[in-house]
Amino acid sequence: MLDENEDIHPLFAGAPATTEFKKLRKRIVRYTREAIEQYGMVERRADGSTPKWLVCLSGGKDSYTLLAVLYELKWRGLLPVDLLACNLDQGQPGFPSTVLPEFLDRMGVPNRIEYQDTYSVVVDKVPQGRTYCALCSRLRRGNLYRIAREEGCSAVVLGHHRDDILETFFMNLFHGGRLATMPPKLVNEEGDLFVFRPLAHVAEADCEKFARAMNYPIIPCDLCGSQDGLQRQQVKQILDGWEKNRPGRRQVMFRALMNARPSHLLDPKLFDFQGLELGSREKGENFGEIPLLR
């Protein structure tokens, strides 16, 4: 196994030698490895073949962090999969189409760059004044699934982090009337591809610090002009306020997503309330009591 302080891939060329950055890098790698192991993302195939992942790269801080940490794990022998980086150029006005191909080629990262003008479709279909995000995301997802199949990949790997998952939970809670979020691992509707989110335990702030320290060529995410007033931005502001008033609240809330008690919720599809009887094992602490936040 390679020494943990060794720069093992061109993606880490010029990495800061500061103690602070080394701690940051080690923390991101540890959390990513934990998520991969905890949620069983690496397939153990009976025929001994190596799984192949399509790593989706948008040019934002999160996807650069994802790509770098996956390559670090792979080069350390801790991630026995083949990686193919993929960028889908959706025809957004002003998108710098040469940035990612040049970066990936310079880094020696196998990649597929594909142009699909979904932007024009979205502009044509979405009424004026509405945000493009939902339809744009659906079209992007369909194209990524197609590319994964064409490339023989068993999984599409996305750069969503802890804060994305928390925000999605509260969006579902506030606007969808359900307790749900982005899972770290799922199977697509067709049943032929996994979708993985290895950065599920990594904080957005860490991704931002990492990508900035590495000086990756960040592409802005607001090229379509459809970002203002989004529900996600509103939820982010709420969470920012909670975190400011009570530092550490984000992590507490995130831990709650891994500590669900169906018997202490209200969904009869998740727990057999009808069959609950005196003397049953499902008893104990009253989770209806609100704990004092310290």
From Swiss-Prot:
A motif (PP-loop motif) lies at residues 58-63. It is found in: Cytoplasm. It holds the Pfam family ATP_bind_3. InterPro entries: Rossmann-like_a/b/a_fold, TilS/TtcA_N, tRNA_Cyd_32_2_STrfase, tRNA_thiolation_TtcA_Ctu1. Transmembrane segments: none annotated. Its EC number is 2.8.1.-. Keywords: 4Fe-4S, ATP-binding, Cytoplasm, Iron, Iron-sulfur, Magnesium, Metal-binding, Nucleotide-binding, RNA-binding, Transferase, tRNA processing, tRNA-binding. GO terms for biological process: tRNA thio-modification. Its main location: cytoplasm. The keyword Nuclease does not apply. [4Fe-4S] cluster binds at C133, C136, C224. It comes from the Bacteria. The keyword Magnesium applies. It catalyses: cytidine(32) in tRNA + S-sulfanyl-L-cysteinyl-[cysteine desulfurase] + AH2 + ATP = 2-thiocytidine(32) in tRNA + L-cysteinyl-[cysteine desulfurase] + A + AMP + diphosphate + H(+). Binds 1 [4Fe-4S] cluster per subunit. The cluster is chelated by three Cys residues, the fourth Fe has a free coordination site that may bind a sulfur atom transferred from the persulfide of IscS. Pathway: tRNA modification. GO terms for molecular function: 4 iron, 4 sulfur cluster binding; ATP binding; magnesium ion binding; sulfurtransferase activity; tRNA binding. HAMAP family: TtcA (MF_01850). Catalyzes the ATP-dependent 2-thiolation of cytidine in position 32 of tRNA, to form 2-thiocytidine (s(2)C32). The sulfur atoms are provided by the cysteine/cysteine desulfurase (IscS) system. Belongs to the TtcA family. The thiolation reaction likely consists of two steps: a first activation step by ATP to form an adenylated intermediate of the target base of tRNA, and a second nucleophilic substitution step of the sulfur (S) atom supplied by the hydrosulfide attached to the Fe-S cluster. Homodimer. This is tRNA-cytidine(32) 2-sulfurtransferase. It comes from Ruegeria pomeroyi (strain ATCC 700808 / DSM 15171 / DSS-3) (Silicibacter pomeroyi). The lineage of its organism: Bacteria, Pseudomonadati, Pseudomonadota, Alphaproteobacteria, Rhodobacterales.
